[in-house]
C-alpha cells in the first residue's frame, strides 16, 4: 500500500502547538501527543492562576489596609473604614487605599478626617 502524503493543515496545527511548547523540556518538547497534553495543561493552569491572582491581590490589599488602619489608629479596623467610605460615597478602591496606607500614611489621616468631618 502506497503512502499518502497528507495536507499542510495538520502540520500547521502541530507547528502551532509546538510553538507554544518551545520552552518545555524533553519529550514535552519533542513528541506531538505529549506537546498537546502539556500545552493544554499549561493553558488550564494559566487561566486558573489568572483568576486566583485577582483574589490573592485583593486579600493582600485588604490586609495592608487593615494593618495600616490599626497601626496608625485611623479607625478600629478595616471594615469600619470601608463602611464609612461607602456611607460617605468616597470612591477609592482597595488597591489605591493600600498604596496610600503603605507609602503615605498622612494621606490616610486626611481621608479619615474627610469621613469624620462629613459626619
Curated annotation (Swiss-Prot):
InterPro entries: Ribosomal_bL20, RIBOSOMAL_L20_CS, Ribosomal_protein_bL20_C. The keyword Transmembrane does not apply. Keywords: Chloroplast, Plastid, Ribonucleoprotein, Ribosomal protein, RNA-binding, rRNA-binding. The keyword DNA repair does not apply. GO terms for molecular function: rRNA binding; structural constituent of ribosome. One of its GO terms (cellular component) is ribosome. SUPFAM superfamilies: Ribosomal protein L20. It is found in: Plastid, Chloroplast. Disulfide bonds: none annotated. Transmembrane segments: none annotated. One of its GO terms (biological process) is translation. Pfam families: Ribosomal_L20. Its main location: plastid. Signal peptide: none annotated. Binds directly to 23S ribosomal RNA and is necessary for the in vitro assembly process of the 50S ribosomal subunit. It is not involved in the protein synthesizing functions of that subunit. Belongs to the bacterial ribosomal protein bL20 family. This is Large ribosomal subunit protein bL20c. It comes from Oryza sativa subsp. indica.
